[in-house]
Amino acid sequence: MNPMRVLSLLACLAVAALAKPNGRMDNSVNQALKPSQWLSGSQLEAIPALDDFTIERLENMNLERGAELLQQVYHLSQIHHNVEPNYVPSGIQVYVPKPNGDKTVAPLNEMIQRLKQKQNFGEDEVTIIVTGLPQTSETVKKATRKLVQAYMQRYNLQQQRQHGKNGNQDYQDQSNEQRKNQRTSSEEDYSEEVKNAKTQSGDIIVIDLGSKLNTYERYAMLDIEKTGAKIGKWIVQMVNELDMPFDTIHLIGQNVGAHVAGAAAQEFTRLTGHKLRRVTGLDPSKIVAKSKNTLTGLARGDAEFVDAIHTSVYGMGTPIRSGDVDFYPNGPAAGVPGASNVVEAAMRATRYFAESVRPGNERSFPAVPANSLQQYKQNDGFGKRAYMGIDTAHDLEGDYILQVNPKSPFGRNAPAQKQSSYHGVHQAWNTNQDSKDYQ
């Protein structure tokens, strides 16, 4: 049976059961639906057909409605635990941005030959970004662009100083429309802190997986393990053919790309016996399709250090802890302050990380151990300070909460007092916390 028909069949089954005169389900159906969320017939009928379920549609819904819809679809997919992934994209495009705004673009299987032509590539830090949503969304496109710009500014800081450039120069495609839209907020303002920021050089690679996930069917049915293994093998090949150190690689994944990044890191370890230095998940997604008897998803142990930023736990994101340390801006919720829909909420993790990458902003997001925003507020934000973003300490563990601004600059850079324990403790969520915490 086509796996994508499972959701429709389950929906019909649930509608028929709910339509019984006594309003109760027989034991077999009742058992089959556990632990899914109960839905009325009208709610099930309101769920759009897969062909109509697009990122644009989610962007046109308010945050609460979009989060509710995604929760319903996810729970339906988990009823029988038999929605198997079947999509492994081919011809994934990769690009390497240049300081002048140009890009080197090639399919994944051709990029290594292009990299060999770049002088000194891989001698310093290499950051690999795996996108998880299509760039057809302006929200997604902008967040990814901000992250790339931030790294280009960070890696070319010394060159900027030598040529007298300031922070007003962004590295991006030099079209009129993009120039018109660039630097619309204070997160990119050049400050005195930049003058004192540490100099660092490196290279950035963007694996644009998200552009292959242009339908919900592809997104939901993505085979995370096989796609990640493909990227992991590519990283091994790159390290070997370019004779570059593997311990300078930082792998970053957005949304479902976070899980693919984790799988890629696992494949790298399987093939080499070594772990990558760091994997960062930017709002890791819920996983709809899962292979039986296989643990899937970003997790601690995928690299020497795994960190995750969760900005739409009850929307596009997942409530499942994904790293050695998990950060929850404004606590676990459907979204974060200033995000009007689930797509914007999901991409805020990328915006926050991008802000921390910019020279001088490395410690703009101080956080403290807590398992809810309520607990954070009860302690007035006091606790052992840790920093979310590029400067996160690699020996950090546990759950961390922080508050963020609704608009850029998002980081509050608020003080936090010391406590005896350095590590946060993984605790159960406070299920009584309501949605007001993220408004």
Curated annotation (Swiss-Prot):
Pfam hit, one: Lipase
Superkingdom, taxonomy of origin: Eukaryota
Induction or repression: By beta-ecdysone; in males.
GO molecular function annotation: serine hydrolase activity
Chain positions with Phosphotyrosine modification: 171, 190
Purpose of the protein: Vitellogenin is the major yolk protein of eggs where it is used as a food source during embryogenesis. Along with Yp2 and Yp3, and their receptor yl/yolkless, required for maintenance of microtubule plus-end orientation towards the posterior pole of oocytes. Involved in polarized localization of germ plasm components, such as osk mRNA and vas protein, to the oocyte posterior cortex. Receptor-mediated endocytosis by yl/yolkless is crucial for actin reorganization, mediated by osk isoform A/Long, required to anchor germ plasm components to the oocyte cortex.
UniProt similarity note: Belongs to the AB hydrolase superfamily. Lipase family.
Protein name: Vitellogenin-1
Organism of provenance: Drosophila melanogaster
Organism ancestry: Eukaryota, Metazoa, Ecdysozoa, Arthropoda, Hexapoda
Protein encoded by which gene: Yp1
